[in-house]
Swiss-Prot record:
GO terms for cellular component: endoplasmic reticulum; fungal-type vacuole membrane. It is a single-pass membrane protein. Involved in vacuolar protein sorting. It is found in: Membrane. The keyword Magnesium does not apply. This is Vacuolar protein sorting-associated protein 62. Present with 623 molecules/cell in log phase SD medium. Glycans are attached at N74, N145.
Amino acid sequence: MRISKNSHKRQRTRLYFLVTFIIYSIIPCRAVLVPWLDDDPFEATLLEMGDEPWSKDILSSTPPLHPSEVTEDNKSLKQRGNVPQYVIDNSPLLHLYSEEKYWPADVKDFVKRFQLRDHSGEKIINEHLRDLSDLQEYYSVELENGTWGRVSSEGTYMTSLDDFDKGPDWLLGEQPEYGTGHIKKAPAVLFVVDKGNGWVDAFWFYFYPFNWGPYIMGSGPWGNHVGDWEHSLVRFYKGEPQYLWMSAHGGGSAYKFEAIEKIKRLRRVDGKLTNEVIKKPLIFSARGTHAHYASVGQHAHDVPFFFMPLSDFTDRGPLWDPSLNYYAYTVTVGEKMTPCGAEETKMGLEWLSFKGAWGDKQLRPRDPRQKWCPFQWKYIDGPKGPLFKNMERVSLCQRFKWWNFWKGCPARRYIKRGEGLDAEKNDLVGDNCGILLYNIRPKWLRSILRFLTWRGSVCFIMDYFTG
């Protein structure tokens, strides 16, 4: 059957009007053509939150600098060895998982459980580690010819004195105090890094003795390792918080600071409570892996949208306030690191330069404790320490996936919502399909597009580029 030219023309006309309708339903000036499309029941709430999703990013006008480029003329920190009050006021609070097994710990106590060995299992020093001072960048070792040489700590491993597979008590860590969120025996580690031009980065590091990996289809856990460093970054401009980045499995997520959920707390100045009420940002720490997320629920582990069986889980478990107990350092002009207190001075700086792994080497395949699945080993290498987490970065992101060749790191404007039964349903929380969906009117059209793009590649593209 032949189709007339008029029929083709009518089809093109219909397609044109449909595309035009969708476009003008999305762009900010859509109400000029169709006034009722701008009826937004959440508009007042968004204005209350101070969200301006289409405003110019301050990063592009006055960018932060690499620490090596910071000088006396453009520095942001006025005093070395002093933590600004705004860093404490805007420090993250962490909801640890309600059924967590492995809680935070103190690095000073942790190191006493280890010997230091190289990749072949040979001892670097004969005795076990006594304290942090035994962690160094270089070691003097006796060579086979009887002479002494200097070797790097690169490729060394803190090797457990106990069999970690049997779950010794020191792997369990310490739980936060109910009500205050204080953990007496688990200080966080804070680095306040001057990025010049008014920018300051506050890196909060959280240490756990053990990483309990995820399950796959009921089998596991996989990817376990002794020692676990997680961290968050709050980026300030002229004393005001602008962004928050949170780590998860070697990657992480960046958010506009105003997008993050916050809770009210009494302000502390010099460690003492005041009557002033402030709002602090919330991070949700996943069960076992301690990966960070901005919402409650099930989160696909490293594989966005497409492989939910490998997942992290978060909820509103015990609240930890790292600002109540921490070791602190500042990094200022000349990339000089300065301890911020007597305890940090006593600990020294050498332990931070240790290039080895904060935990055991991956068990060999023939070790009876080791298991393998198509995706992962049961036990893998321990992590590197804080100075190897790219704190000098100008981008918000610590690193980039192989496919991200343009090295983009957009800050999300809406919280990315978790999946599953525990996820909290809220139209002000992103639904993994990007904020463009929130600008589509009428609601029936938005519902159709939500359905069509659910968990598909379109979702991933929208989510990445629109936040």
